[in-house]
């Protein structure tokens, strides 16, 4: 190192000059131990700072920067940035690691020497420099250095202090940016801020002496337009050389805090005019490129005619800087004339463990001087724990539980709490008072109304146990109530709203990343302001591309695209376009390089792209943008399941500082990631509302899957191009593909934002949250039970009730998704599924068949909420007894209905409020000339009210709900069943036929073809039923022109929609059929849809059968020929839990494929995701369920091919067969034949045993012809002993007319002259062997599952039975039936008797002419041989008990016992 101006010499050091200091200290310690009093002596400390003026200090800093203080390093290794040693940001631990690289990156300050573009300043470049031969210095043309030019631009910028305070920047319309930097401000006339706007003092961090010492220096604002237009740029303009560098220039974001402005306080010195001229030309060039960008295209994608980049700047705002004075808060005058802090809260956060009793509120505050809203954070402190102690009547000994008989007063309760409880749980200070409270919930021995001891103590003290009891008190309520809940309920805050804070205080230390911060010392200083419109919010739509690292198997982020709208309204229609600005950032993989022509390609396309040469730089840049844009809402797809977790993991892995900028609360310790509940990810983003459109879509619409591609297709009617993860790595091979990949990321962000707008997610969530009174970020996570919980919490708290404590479950139920796709998997473990907790809605037995006359569908409006109102069912009105231990658990205890004279309970009152509010809003929507924005606002509000009201009943029956009340839920459903039965009886009394009913609706067969008459009939029925109720109301829900009713909850119909003038149009409606379920392939669904459309059409029956035959034959041929697209074979099935949690992974195809997807990297599939797979032939003998593959596997592996046999027999055939079941002339075997399958495998017993017995009692079989009766029987076969030809016999006689003769008379081969009757003994033996074979087949006892897709076959009788028979252990969906039932055996034996019954055939089968001919021919010998064969069958049938009815046994119950 050089001696002059060395590092040590240039810095002040705090040094102890006195050498005897240690000795003196020991002497003082010795005297103190001896008892001598020691006085504290204040030493006069000399100043450790050298005081200089601003100009001198700036010159000193520049001298340090210019000094090459490392000897012989040629300026390549280290750089002096001129700062003091205490300017380093010591707050974040990550800096310790980043400092090891000895890079010259700026440390959270703006007085930074910009590093040279020509040589990167990092260790890698130093080693590279040492490895090559040293060359002589070349002359450098400074006029071509745009970074130097940028510094020269700063010469005219405004003067700033050394440690400038943060700048709040709100952007307005800007033109297209420079080729590489979308954040540079183009040369436009600046907006000069008024001089009255004050500058905030610097927000300093603890242990930051330099910042603290200069915090009071205000920023000076000069009206210099030319300086403003240059200095307001976020980063310098970049040139082509930057792409080739590793960590230099603007991509060096190692440790910097990007919210700081990047101006320097420099001394103005003369500048060479040529440099200024060059800079002016550069600006002019940028301006021309901005104009060109509007016309140029980026890259033509598969889905867009022109590149999306051409339209991205249509609504971009101008950039203006807003400066907020943090020396005082932006106060306004309240209603009482006092000065209050008014802000709109959007999100709330609490940390019950590290900061108990503190709630952080995040929102927006209006800055009058800047005419804009900025973010704010309010810390509400000192929220006390509040518990209620219920006194006993008499004192009880806790050890024995005996009643001592001594009465208990409130003073006794206080004394026990003070002496026993407070001391045990270290509650040093508490307040208490006597209060009167009501209770109406499920703890049996709590009185309806009583005096309680209310105790309040600091949240810093421990939480009391929930089951705490004492000698003087029996229960303690409110022990585990969170501070946030206490705050929201006590201050009556219902969702995002305007709040006023009295006596707010400035925050002594920065606690958040918000622009304005305030502290409230008492929660009662917060009050709600009503009837003010919500402010606009900043919305950011996010999309990412990741690649899995082959070594670490971690997802690494390579590209991020984001769209931003700075003034997104929450109470109006979404803006068009839905974004104003955007940014994209692209990184390269560690083992890849950018294409050689990438920089040129970007410049030609004028794309707005930031380049980050490492993932760490990309993440640092992203956090900087998040902080600068400061979004209130971050929108994404599967953002909770993937994006947030990956972002936080990569930020942690790359040791990027200020990770907490992803949210709004400053934190240093990152929460532990990887939990299945996503708890850490949610907390990390606190302060910013996370909107996951996947969760919102699941609540608002029905889709076969909720992948982004499917949502784009269904909602936006567009097609999304998906880039497979392996193609992302390949995209770095050339610029075209790399730019296309980045554009694809941008388009995904646009799709996400458009879907959010299309579904009105934010306004709807806001309305629901305002109704329920919870937190909006929780509403967007889709938890309906929490919404109902908060609505009831507010209602009961306002009515002076003690609310039930949040239940604590020892073993939480595994996260499952409400889906029936995986019914019965691992049933033994989930006992709750075996039997419902109480009886649900009533489903009437359907009258299966096809109806071609008008069917009337009547439906009760909101049945369960209406029942709760009609009968005043509430916690406060229904008397519930304690569950009896003597009664069986299976016995439902239905409580009595409340008396009609009782006052309306809180639950029906709340529902009535919702219903009346919705009715009022719908009336407002009918106003003429209504503003479209207002109409949309009303529509969203009525939807929110409807969603909330309809889900209110659910909290009663949900066992994990805080307001779970099984008796109330059972009473509601019981009344629903009674109402449906009563409705059915009333309709039948009107001489009408009810063909089906389900929970809240009935179907009536009108036997009428006149639509007008049907409506009259419906209105008559409706008025008669509604007379019986005050609030319950039934209405005409629809009219079906034709209906195919298959079974319970499964039907297809043509609904009638009148168009006026007596005309109507029809629309197909499907309920519960296979073709509306997602676990059937598209091929089967299309076949089923076609069959249904044919059946419901007006064509003749023969034409329908013929059309179905043609279609199925065509499908069979197309599948066999391989002309069906692969997408038609995809089967979709949802995961009800995480793939690794399934016990039998191999037997479940979607789980098997899900595990493969997770092993490939990229997005991990989890519970709730829908998996698409195809069944393939892979050369193995495994079952179809184990031959499931993802479509990507099919395309990559040559040995895989579609299993056409499976799709025809297990997908198309079952779907079509079930639909055609009630249709005469079509059966399973016929459908199989049309599809090209073996019909013998599908000769299924279509009718169940119970149906067959009913038919037999009604004489069904006797009405069938012999041909129909024996249609499914196997024919008798006999090989001719002479020629070996197989003869098949199915009747006594062959031929007709004069050619008729016994079937056994001659061999079926014309050339053979042998007669089987000559070998009657052999025929007899063959017949006996066949009979024995069938009897053996019956007694082998094979059982098969009646579900065609299951194909389970077993001889083991399961232990679990249903009403219809033993339940299949394989699928747990259907029952097992005998593969060869007794009726089939009996019918087969009867068939053998039929083909040898000479007398019966002579009398019943042949005509009179043929009968006379047979008698003339004298077949006496043949007749005797036939009778011998028949007698063999008769002997066997005589031993069968199937055809006998034991009358004595049948009527034995009628015998009287003597």
Swiss-Prot record:
SUPFAM superfamilies registered for this protein in UniProt: DNA/RNA polymerases, Ribonuclease H-like, Zinc finger domain of DNA polymerase-alpha
Chemical reaction(s) catalysed: DNA(n) + a 2'-deoxyribonucleoside 5'-triphosphate = DNA(n+1) + diphosphate
Ranges of Basic and acidic residues composition bias in the record: 15-25
A single GO molecular function term of this UniProt record: single-stranded DNA binding
Keyword Translocase: no
Chief location bin: nucleus
Transmembrane segments: none
PROSITE patterns: DNA_POLYMERASE_B
UniProt short sequence motif CysB motif, positions renumbered to this chain: 1345-1371
Entries under Gene3D superfamilies matching the protein: 2.40.50.730, 3.30.70.2820, DNA Polymerase alpha, zinc finger, DNA polymerase family B, C-terminal domain, Helix hairpin bin, Palm domain of DNA polymerase, Ribonuclease H-like superfamily/Ribonuclease H
Binding site for Zn(2+) 1: 1280, 1283, 1307, 1312
Family: Belongs to the DNA polymerase type-B family.
Identification of the protein by name: DNA polymerase alpha catalytic subunit
């Amino acid at each position: 190192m050089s001696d002059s101006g060395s590092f040590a010499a240039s810095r002040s050091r705090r040094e102890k000059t006195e050498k005897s200091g240690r000795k003196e200290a020991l002497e003082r310690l010795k005297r103190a131990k001896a008892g001598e009093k020691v006085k504290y002596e204040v030493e006069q400390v000399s100043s450790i700072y050298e005081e200089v003026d601003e100009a001198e200090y700036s010159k000193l800093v520049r001298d340090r920067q210019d000094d090459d203080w490392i000897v012989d390093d040629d300026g390549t290794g280290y750089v002096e940035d001129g700062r003091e040693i205490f300017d380093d940001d010591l707050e974040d631990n990550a800096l310790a690691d980043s400092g090891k690289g000895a890079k010259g990156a700026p440390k959270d300050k703006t007085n930074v020497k910009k590093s040279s573009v020509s040589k990167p300043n990092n260790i890698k470049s130093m080693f590279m420099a040492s490895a090559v031969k040293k060359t002589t210095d070349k002359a450098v043309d400074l006029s071509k250095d745009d970074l130097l030019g940028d510094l020269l631009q700063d010469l005219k910028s405004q003067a700033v202090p050394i440690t400038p305070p943060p700048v709040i920047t709100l952007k307005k319309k800007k033109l297209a940016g420079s080729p590489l930097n979308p954040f540079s401000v183009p040369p436009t006339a600046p907006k000069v801020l008024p001089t009255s706007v004050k500058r905030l003092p610097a927000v300093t961090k603890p242990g930051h002496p330099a910042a603290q010492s200069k915090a009071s220096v205000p920023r000076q604002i000069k009206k210099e337009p030319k300086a403003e237009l240059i200095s307001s740029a976020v980063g310098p303009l970049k040139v082509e050389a930057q792409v080739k560098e590793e960590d230099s220039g603007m991509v060096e974001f190692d440790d910097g805090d990007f919210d700081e402005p990047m101006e320097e306080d420099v001394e103005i010195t003369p500048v060479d005019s040529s440099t200024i001229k060059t800079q002016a030309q550069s600006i002019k060039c940028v301006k021309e490129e901005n104009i060109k960008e509007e016309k140029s295209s980026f890259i033509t994608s598969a889905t867009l005619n022109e590149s999306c980049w051409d339209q991205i700047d249509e609504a971009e705002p101008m950039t203006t800087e807003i400066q907020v004075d943090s020396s005082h808060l932006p106060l306004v005058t309240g209603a009482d004339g006092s000065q209050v802090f008014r802000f709109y809260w959007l999100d709330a956060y609490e940390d019950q463990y590290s900061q108990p009793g503190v709630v952080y509120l995040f929102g927006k505050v209006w800055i009058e001087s800047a005419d804009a809203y900025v973010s704010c954070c309010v810390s509400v402190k000192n929220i006390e724990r509040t518990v209620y102690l219920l006194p006993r009547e008499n004192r009880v000994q806790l050890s024995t539980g005996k009643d001592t008989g001594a009465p208990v007063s409130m003073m006794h309760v206080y004394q026990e709490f003070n002496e026993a409880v407070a001391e045990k749980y270290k509650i040093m200070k508490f307040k208490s008072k006597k209060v009167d409270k009501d209770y109406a919930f499920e703890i049996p021995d709590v009185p309806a109304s009583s005096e309680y001891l209310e105790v309040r103590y600091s949240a810093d003290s421990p939480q009391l146990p929930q089951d705490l009891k004492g000698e003087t008190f029996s229960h303690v309520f409110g022990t585990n109530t969170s501070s946030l809940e206490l705050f929201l309920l006590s201050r009556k805050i219902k969702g995002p709203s305007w709040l006023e804070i009295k006596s707010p205080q400035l925050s002594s230390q920065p606690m958040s990343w918000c622009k304005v911060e305030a502290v409230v010392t008492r929660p009662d200083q917060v009050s709600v302001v009503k009837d003010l419109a919500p402010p606009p919010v900043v919305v950011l739509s996010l999309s990412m591309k990741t690649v899995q690292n082959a070594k670490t198997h971690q997802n690494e982020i390579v590209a991020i695209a984001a769209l931003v709208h700075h003034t997104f309204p929450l109470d109006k229609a979404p803006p068009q376009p839905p974004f104003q600005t955007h940014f994209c950032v692209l990184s390269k993989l560690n083992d890849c390089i950018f294409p050689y022509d990438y920089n040129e390609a970007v410049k030609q396309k004028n794309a707005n792209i930031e380049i980050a040469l490492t993932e760490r730089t990309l993440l640092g840049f992203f956090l900087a943008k998040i902080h600068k844009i400061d979004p209130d809402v971050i929108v994404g797809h599967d953002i909770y399941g993937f994006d947030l977790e990956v972002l936080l993991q990569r930020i942690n892995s790359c040791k990027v500082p200020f990770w907490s900028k992803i949210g709004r609360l400053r934190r240093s310790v990152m929460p532990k990631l990887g939990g299945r509940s996503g708890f850490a990810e949610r907390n990390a983003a606190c302060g910013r509302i996370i909107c996951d459109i996947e969760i919102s879509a699941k609540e608002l619409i029905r889709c076969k899957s909720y992948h982004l591609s499917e949502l784009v297709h269904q909602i936006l009617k567009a097609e999304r191009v998906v880039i497979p993860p392996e193609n992302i790595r390949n995209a770095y091979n050339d610029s075209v593909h790399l730019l296309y990949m980045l554009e694809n990321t941008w388009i995904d962000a646009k799709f996400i934002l458009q879907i959010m707008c299309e579904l009105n997610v934010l306004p709807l969530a806001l309305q629901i949250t305002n109704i329920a009174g919870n937190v909006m970020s929780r509403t967007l996570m889709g938890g309906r039970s929490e919404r109902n919980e908060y609505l009831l919490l507010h209602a009961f708290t306002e009515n002076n009730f003690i609310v039930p404590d949040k239940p604590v479950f020892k073993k939480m139920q595994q996260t499952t998704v409400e889906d029936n796709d995986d019914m019965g998997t691992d049933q033994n473990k989930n006992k709750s599924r075996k039997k419902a907790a109480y009886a649900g809605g009533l489903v009437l037995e359907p009258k299966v068949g096809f109806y071609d006359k008008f069917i009337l569908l009547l439906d009760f409006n909101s049945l369960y909420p209406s029942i709760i109102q009609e009968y005043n069912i509430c916690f406060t009105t229904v008397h519930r007894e304690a569950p009896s231990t003597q009664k069986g658990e299976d016995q439902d205890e239905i409580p009595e209905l409340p008396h009609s004279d009782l006052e309306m309970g809180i639950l029906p009152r709340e529902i009535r409020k919702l219903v009346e509010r919705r009715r009022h809003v719908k009336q407002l929507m009918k106003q003429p000339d209504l503003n479209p924005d207002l109409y949309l606002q009303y529509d969203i509000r009525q939807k929110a009210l409807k969603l909330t009201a309809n889900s209110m009943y659910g909290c009663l029956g949900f066992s994990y709900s805080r307001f779970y009340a099984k008796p109330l839920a059972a009473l509601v459903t019981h009344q629903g069943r009674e109402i449906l039965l009563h409705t059915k009886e009333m309709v039948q009394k009107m001489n009408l036929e009810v063909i089906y009913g389900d929970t809240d609706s009935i179907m009536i067969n009108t036997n009428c073809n006149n639509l007008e008459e049907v409506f009259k009939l419906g209105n008559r029925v409706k008025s008669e039923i509604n007379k019986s109720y005050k609030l319950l109301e039934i209405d005409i829900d629809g009219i079906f022109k034709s209906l195919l009713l298959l079974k319970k909850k499964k039907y297809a119909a043509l609904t009638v929609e009148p168009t006026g003038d007596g005309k109507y149009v029809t629309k197909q409606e499907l309920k519960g059929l296979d073709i509306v379920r997602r676990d059937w392939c598209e091929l089967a669904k299309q076949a089923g849809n076609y069959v249904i459309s044919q059946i419901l059409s007006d064509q003749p029956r023969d034409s329908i059968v013929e059309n179905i035959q043609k279609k199925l034959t065509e499908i069979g041929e197309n599948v066999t020929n391989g002309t069906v697209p692969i997408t038609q074979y995809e089967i979709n099935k949802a995961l009800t839990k995480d793939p690794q949690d399934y016990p039998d992974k191999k037997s479940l195809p979607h789980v098997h494929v899900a595990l493969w997807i997770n092993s490939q990297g990229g997005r991990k599939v989890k519970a709730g995701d829908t998996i698409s797979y195809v069944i393939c032939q892979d050369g193995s003998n495994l079952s179809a369920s184990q031959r499931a593959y993802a479509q990507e596997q099919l395309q990559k592996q040559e040995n895989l091919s579609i299993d056409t046999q499976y799709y025809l027999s297990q997908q198309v055939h079952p779907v079509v067969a079930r639909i055609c079941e009630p249709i005469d002339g079509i059966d399973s075997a016929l459908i199989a034949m049309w599809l090209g399958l073996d019909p013998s495998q599908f000769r299924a017993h279509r009718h169940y045993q119970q149906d067959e017995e009913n038919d037999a009692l009604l004489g069904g079989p006797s009405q069938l012809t012999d041909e129909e009766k024996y249609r499914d029987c196997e024919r008798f076969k006999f090989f001719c002993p002479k020629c070996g030809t197989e003869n098949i016999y199915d009747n006594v006689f062959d031929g007709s007319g004069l050619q008729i003769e016994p079937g056994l008379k001659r061999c079926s081969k014309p050339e053979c002259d042998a007669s089987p009757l000559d070998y009657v003994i052999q025929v007899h033996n063959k017949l006996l062997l066949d009979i024995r074979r069938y009897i053996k087949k019956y007694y082998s006892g094979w059982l098969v599952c009646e579900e065609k897709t299951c194909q389970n076959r077993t001889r083991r009788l399961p232990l679990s039975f249903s009403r219809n028979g033993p339940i299949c252990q394989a699928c747990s969906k259907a029952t097992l039936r005998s593969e060869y039932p007794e009726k089939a055996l009996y019918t087969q034996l009867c068939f053998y008797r039929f083909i040898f019954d000479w007398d019966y055939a002579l009398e019943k089968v042949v005509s009179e002419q043929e009968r006379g001919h047979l008698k003339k021919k004298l077949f006496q010998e043949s007749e005797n041989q036939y009778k011998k064969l028949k007698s063999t069958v008769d002997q066997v049938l005589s031993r069968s008990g199937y055809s006998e009815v034991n009358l004595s046994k049948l009527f034995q119950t009628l015998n009287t016992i003597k």
